[in-house]
Amino acid sequence: MTDAAAPRDPLEALVEGVTIVELDPAETSVGRGGLPNAEGVVQLDACCMDGPRRRAGAVAALERFATAARVAHRVMCDTPHHLVAGSGAHDFALACGFAEEDLLTPKARGLWIEWRRRVEARAESKSDPSTIRDAGYAIGLEMSREGLMDANHLWGTINCNAVGPRGEICGVTTTSGLAWKMPGRIGDSPILGAGLYVRQDVGAAGSTGRGESTLYNLSSFAIVDALRRGAHPRDAGMDALRQIVADTVDPALLSERGAPNFNVKFYVVNAAGECAGVALYGGDAVRYAVCTENGPELRVCDALLEGTIG
């Protein structure tokens, strides 16, 4: 975070900042060590946006390369495209000189094996995709309640946005996606306007949490558009969360009390440097990092709903 305040390209600083976490094998939300899909394969998504250049780059379903944000940045810098996916993303990363590796760590593999064991014990039809949707997600919540994993890492992601010393606005989002997802599933993180949106002279917004909910509303775009109309970052983020609550009607996504059984968090900054972190569910552990000329600090996200996930 402190690097992003240094006199260099702000987007490059953000990419290098999230790369530190992508390379940490103990981190199960991104990169090396990220939780795999239903078949035990780690597939990564990432996106970056550069406000002054009006450019963006993204990769989706990227396998065997830990630093997805760096690859997304190369897509932005070296191609005319915004998004490269699957085998094309793999071949592009290889051509750029990135090193292949097995991203599935012993920790992530152990969690996947336990999840798979429970799914197979309960599934009526192991070939039915709805098994992964219904039993699979419920078991992930069950494992989090048992303390086997952090519930927030079911949708683990990093979003980092910046306003540079000359007013440059940029952002990056990187993720290993929904834990135990259907192979090939792509969430909001690499999609412009969903997991990340930047508008120079206005602001930036990004998300972590259940990607399908932000995809449905293009929430990051909606937040930045609210900033353009004069909303404060906190108010813009809270309005986006309220829309997600209103649109969550699938019984499989509702708790016994009728509230969403997942979390979504938005991180918002405007051109003046005012920022906010908001979440469906909060608590002292639900925090976001802010770095200014006064140094870095952790702040608690403002929560829309009371209670906890599930």
Label each residue range with its predicted role.
Residues M1-G310:
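Alpha/propeptide regions of enzymes that mature by internal proteolysis
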